[in-house]
Amino acid sequence: MIPLSIRVPASTANVGPGFDSVGIALSLYLHVVVKEKSDKWQVIHSFEDSIPTDDKNLIVSTACKVCPSLSPHIIEVTSNIPLTRGLGSSASAIVAGIELANQLGKLNLTTDQKVQIATNFEGHPDNVAASILGGTVIGALDGKNVSVVRIESKELGVISLIPNEELNTDESRSVLPDVFPFHEAVKASAISNVLVAALCQKKWEVVGEMMERDHFHEPYRLELIPLLPSIRKCAKEFGAYGTALSGAGPSIFILTPYEKRQEIAEQLARVFTSMKVCELEIDHRGITVNKKEHIGL
């Protein structure tokens, strides 16, 4: 029997113009299983060698920052969230670390506290809030204060096109401008406002239109993801609502009518053969914890 297990969903961020604010939880998952106490932290995983197996692992280091008095444990980590592909892999690790500290340290953190802590670590609420809450989230970080609203989007299907190449978030952010002209900011924020209103009112065609009209980041990142325009064109022809970069990229995120997601995914897979086409769903549960026979930890 598993003593303690934690499951954290992947996430996509921005949804076009909702830069560092809008996030959606996805049906790819990071799992953490706590095995037993140990004299030092040990992380069992089958990822690449660059992922630490000790207290330098992001999950463990996050947990120890949240609760420095934690006793070391052996944990096993598995995940089908692609690394450095714009699907919230680091955010899911941060969220898992916070929950690990919460459970082992008996901190009794509220959901709002978890979102606040995770946002402070990540620097923006979109990915981490989606992974904690599930569904679609709209968040804002003002200084140290985080405000998040969660909405349901059960009528939507999701497709992700994942390239073989990695793209580091820092590299993707390096192409963004340091200064944004006032008139461009007005235009960009208006589009983002309509996106959020359309999400809340379930006006999916408007959502699709707005998510393809971003001015904040996608125009600058096109040089790093040159296939985006052709994928966007094909997806629309196949019946999708809209297409955008997933987070900082390089993955592409597509919203579809729920009942058409499989058909559209199959059509895209036939065209873009160099990319992995994943038919996904929006995760509506967020982080989950299984504490069966969690004794003596």
Swiss-Prot record:
Catalysis: reaction(s): L-homoserine + ATP = O-phospho-L-homoserine + ADP + H(+)
InterPro entries: GHMP_kinase_C_dom, GHMP_kinase_C_sf, GHMP_kinase_N_dom, GHMP_knse_ATP-bd_CS, Homoserine_kinase, Ribosomal_Su5_D2-typ_SF, Ribsml_uS5_D2-typ_fold_subgr
PROSITE patterns: GHMP_KINASES_ATP
Subcellular location: Cytoplasm
Any Gene Ontology biological process: threonine biosynthetic process
Positions of ATP binding: P82, L83, T84, R85, G86, L87, G88, S89, S90, A91, S92
Similarity comment text for this entry: Belongs to the GHMP kinase family. Homoserine kinase subfamily.
Job of this protein: Catalyzes the ATP-dependent phosphorylation of L-homoserine to L-homoserine phosphate.
Protein's UniProt name: Homoserine kinase
